[in-house]
Every structure is written in C-alpha cells, then in structure tokens.
C-alpha cells in the first residue's frame, strides 16, 4: 500500500473512531456527566447532525487543493476530540461531538478524489476501497479498545486516543499525500 493511501485510511479510521467510540462508552459518559442514558444518546445524534451539516462545506472549499482540505478536515475532527477530552459539561461535550461530525462527509468525498488520482491506471476503485477500509477497522478494533480503556480508566481516554490518532494522521497526510489539482468548478 502506498504511504499516501495508508494516511487516507488512517484518516477514515480516525473518523470511524470519532463516530462509533461513543457507543461503547455511553453509560460511562452518562454516569460521569450525571445525565440519563437516553439523554447521553443525543451524543450519537448530534454527531450525525454534524455529518449532515459538514457535507455542504465542500461547496465553500472547492477552490482549495484537496490536500489542504484534508489537513483542515483532519484538524477539525482532532479539535473536536480535544474538546471532548476536556469537556467539563454535557453541553460542551455535545458541541464537541457536533464538531467531530462536521468533517466526516467532506473527508470521504475529498479523500476519494485524492485516492483515485494517486492510483495507477485502472486501480482507482481499489485505492478508494483501501482508503475506506479504515472505517470497518475502527469498528472492529477501535471501539472495543476504547470501551476497554473507558472502563479501565476514564471515558475521556478514548477521546484522547482520537486526539493522538488525529495528530498522527495530520503528519502522515502532510508528509505522504501528494498535491493534486483541485476539481474544476462546473457550476
């Protein structure tokens, strides 16, 4: 696997962690934040709302090079994880989850373009599949690990793990993802 594709896949893994980690730690969060489990469940819904709202951000970012967009989006999900890690209140944690959701759709759209452009002729589909592989790995490995860390230490530790993943992903995208042309604006 090319290093650039690995960086993109780590980005989807990081997004998958951001999206799904809450499911394994929901009861710990509810207990610590002194809210009911159904109320803590809004932390899942608000992420989805962020995904929907953030999908439109590509309209505003179309003039920038895809690598810069990926760096910005990865920074945003990492910022959300930082806020979640230190959130002193349920309401700030809700805001953090919304911020974490914002880059989701735009990252996949931009990452797909970059993966195809990085691929050899006729291998674009394989490159996109490799990039998207991070998401199921987040479910398979990241969520159980995050749940274990939450139960063993604190629900904040999995978010801290997301911060570390985000920083590593930023470095890898910066170092290994090539500059590709922005898509032409057709309308």
Language model regions located:
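Short hydrophobic/small-residue motifs within alpha-helical transmembrane segments
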Residues: 47-49, 136-137
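Helix-breaking motifs and short loop linkers at transmembrane-helix boundaries and internal kinks
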Residues: 34, 86-92
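Structural signature of the two symmetry-related core transmembrane helices
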Residues: 69-82
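Helix-to-loop junctions at the C-terminal end of transmembrane segments
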Residues: 54-66
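Helix-loop-helix hairpin linking two adjacent transmembrane segments in secondary transporters
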Residues: 92, 130-175
């Amino acid at each position: 696997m090319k290093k650039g594709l690995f960086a993109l896949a780590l980005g989807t893994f990081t997004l998958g962690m951001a999206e799904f980690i809450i499911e394994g730690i929901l009861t710990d969060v509810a207990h610590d934040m002194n809210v009911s489990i159904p109320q803590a469940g809004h932390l899942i819904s608000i992420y989805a709302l962020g995904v929907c709202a953030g999908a439109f951000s590509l309209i505003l970012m179309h003039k920038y090079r895809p690598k810069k967009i990926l760096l910005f989006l990865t920074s945003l999900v990492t910022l959300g994880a930082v806020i979640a890690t230190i959130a002193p209140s349920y309401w700030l944690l809700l805001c953090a989850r919304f911020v974490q959701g914002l880059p989701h759709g735009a990252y996949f759209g931009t990452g797909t373009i970059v993966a195809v452009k990085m691929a050899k002729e006729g291998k674009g589909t394989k490159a996109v599949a490799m990039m998207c592989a991070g998401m199921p790995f987040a479910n398979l490995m990241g969520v159980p690990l995050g749940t274990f860390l939450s139960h063993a230490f604190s629900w904040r530790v999995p978010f801290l793990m997301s911060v570390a993943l985000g920083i590593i992903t930023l470095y890898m995208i910066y170092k290994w993802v090539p500059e590709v042309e922005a898509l032409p604006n057709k309308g």
